[in-house]
């Protein structure tokens, strides 16, 4: 579900621009109560001007013309129009579905393509195909299809001459990408992929395996590139009860490209093997929801790719376009954890974000990741890097801030070591004693290390995952060369294929279950405690939970305000292919709420985040919001209240 503060802020800023420019209405609504524009303006001859719209920066053309089909006659008129504002927030409203396709389709109307002194219309069949695919997403939030994406009015048939506005995004195979005939269906092209090529491969893969895969965007980079994710699940696009969620992230540093390519290959492999009936892959996709983000830093990658492969790109492109190191840009919750851990009776998990964090420079890529992990109940994660050959795990920040190297374990040290070993133990190069190692030689440690014991730093993504959410994340250094040459990519994939699959299967280690009241109603945000491990997980909105646990006997407790706590003993075997099912039924207290350990937000009110991205726990399931009450507006209408008098009433169904 989209976040109200973020969208209101964005729309408020755009509304200020509208008031300052005070343009005339972009079109006359006419007598139609829907507020649709009644006149179309498409000229065959026009004066082409450079395209200067941030939302349309990645369009497949560089020139447009005025007036536009919606009668906009200046950049100010376009940028202050409700149509343009919708394109800026549609990603959030639809939770990443159909983007960037939908945004680029809208750009083709708001800023028509102009070449050689002539405007060109987008193709009708492209619009019709996208509408068919995306209409369910609009229906899910009770939003009408935007009038300016009317396929019959604003788009041209092929016989009249038109262009595909999505060609650069998901177009046909390039000549150099075309696969030779006779190749097996598992063929993967082991080469570096540009941003456009990466998106095309992911979208083609999702289309090929549409029953178990889909793509979506979690946000945009500083330069406007969508952060595209491909997910695999038996029901893609939705969380299934008690199905664990796992994510793999590559290219957080733009010049560390091995993880980017490996995840692109993994997506194709999962799709192909599923279609071929591979029982291991089918079991994995039918019991797990897997999210792959090959490139968290596409802007930095472009800088590194321009310099080329090899050691010469050791630092070029590491940061994002704002010159920020994204793996140092997350809130420093580890320092707060060390402070809390010294106090008995205070929770040290789900630590809120300090308001001071937002006073600094926070990258849009970082914000996108934070919103993502606050929205989806991830259980397990790995961040893929390059430059060494080792698997590290939290904490990454030393418990003594003056020590650059100091063993600093989490309460889940045993589990994190198991996760790290699940990757390293089946990686042939990490276990090869004859291999010349790069950087530090971690073979004596089993090619795993506590992050702070390697080198200490703050603002890392792994520590943030663990201390702010239920998610356990490790960091994998895939090899010595950050930007390997193409001839090394096949070997890189072969070395990491089995470790990746083995790691994904680790999400099923431990226990899972439901927490309900005596009537069977789910208890959301209930706490799952394990005696001897000072780190709790919480239930999702539907009452389901997952708790990664090492082998052994554990006392597990479920509790929630207003209910009596329930305690159970569980035994985790050395080997297990699926998590043990442990349900809890909580009974209400007869004498009022019991005193529980205070959470960090109650113990530390100064750490409440004024710009906090709401988590999934803050929202009812989307199906509960689908139908507005009689006479009321849909929940998303509040996002557009700042646009008076030009509210987009054409988005209302009622």
From Swiss-Prot:
<keyword id="KW-0964">Secreted</keyword>
<feature type="region of interest" description="Disordered">
    <location>
        <begin position="596"/>
        <end position="630"/>
    </location>
</feature>
<keyword id="KW-0862">Zinc</keyword>
<dbReference type="GO" id="GO:0031012">
    <property type="term" value="C:extracellular matrix"/>
</dbReference>
<dbReference type="InterPro" id="IPR000834">
    <property type="entry name" value="Peptidase_M14"/>
</dbReference>
<dbReference type="InterPro" id="IPR034239">
    <property type="entry name" value="M14_CPZ_CPD"/>
</dbReference>
<dbReference type="Pfam" id="PF13620">
    <property type="entry name" value="CarboxypepD_reg"/>
</dbReference>
<feature type="binding site">
    <location>
        <position position="385"/>
    </location>
    <ligand>
        <name>Zn(2+)</name>
    </ligand>
</feature>
<feature type="domain" description="Peptidase M14">
    <location>
        <begin position="191"/>
        <end position="507"/>
    </location>
</feature>
<dbReference type="GO" id="GO:0004181">
    <property type="term" value="F:metallocarboxypeptidase activity"/>
</dbReference>
<keyword id="KW-1015">Disulfide bond</keyword>
<keyword id="KW-0479">Metal-binding</keyword>
<dbReference type="Pfam" id="PF00246">
    <property type="entry name" value="Peptidase_M14"/>
</dbReference>
<feature type="active site" description="Proton donor/acceptor">
    <location>
        <position position="477"/>
    </location>
</feature>
<feature type="domain" description="FZ">
    <location>
        <begin position="43"/>
        <end position="165"/>
    </location>
</feature>
<dbReference type="InterPro" id="IPR050753">
    <property type="entry name" value="Peptidase_M14_domain"/>
</dbReference>
<comment type="function">
    <text>Cleaves substrates with C-terminal arginine residues. Probably modulates the Wnt signaling pathway, by cleaving some undefined protein. May play a role in cleavage during prohormone processing.</text>
</comment>
<protein>
    <recommendedName>
        <fullName>Carboxypeptidase Z</fullName>
        <ecNumber>3.4.17.-</ecNumber>
    </recommendedName>
</protein>
<keyword id="KW-0645">Protease</keyword>
<dbReference type="Pfam" id="PF01392">
    <property type="entry name" value="Fz"/>
</dbReference>
<keyword id="KW-0272">Extracellular matrix</keyword>
<feature type="glycosylation site" description="N-linked (GlcNAc...) asparagine">
    <location>
        <position position="286"/>
    </location>
</feature>
<feature type="disulfide bond">
    <location>
        <begin position="123"/>
        <end position="162"/>
    </location>
</feature>
<dbReference type="InterPro" id="IPR008969">
    <property type="entry name" value="CarboxyPept-like_regulatory"/>
</dbReference>
<dbReference type="GO" id="GO:0016485">
    <property type="term" value="P:protein processing"/>
</dbReference>
<keyword id="KW-0879">Wnt signaling pathway</keyword>
<feature type="binding site">
    <location>
        <position position="256"/>
    </location>
    <ligand>
        <name>Zn(2+)</name>
    </ligand>
</feature>
<dbReference type="InterPro" id="IPR036790">
    <property type="entry name" value="Frizzled_dom_sf"/>
</dbReference>
<dbReference type="GO" id="GO:0005576">
    <property type="term" value="C:extracellular region"/>
</dbReference>
<feature type="disulfide bond">
    <location>
        <begin position="98"/>
        <end position="134"/>
    </location>
</feature>
<dbReference type="InterPro" id="IPR020067">
    <property type="entry name" value="Frizzled_dom"/>
</dbReference>
<dbReference type="GO" id="GO:0016055">
    <property type="term" value="P:Wnt signaling pathway"/>
</dbReference>
<keyword id="KW-0378">Hydrolase</keyword>
<keyword id="KW-0732">Signal</keyword>
<feature type="disulfide bond">
    <location>
        <begin position="56"/>
        <end position="107"/>
    </location>
</feature>
<keyword id="KW-0121">Carboxypeptidase</keyword>
<keyword id="KW-0325">Glycoprotein</keyword>
<feature type="glycosylation site" description="N-linked (GlcNAc...) asparagine">
    <location>
        <position position="62"/>
    </location>
</feature>
<dbReference type="GO" id="GO:0008270">
    <property type="term" value="F:zinc ion binding"/>
</dbReference>
<comment type="similarity">
    <text>Belongs to the peptidase M14 family.</text>
</comment>
<keyword id="KW-0482">Metalloprotease</keyword>
<feature type="disulfide bond">
    <location>
        <begin position="127"/>
        <end position="151"/>
    </location>
</feature>
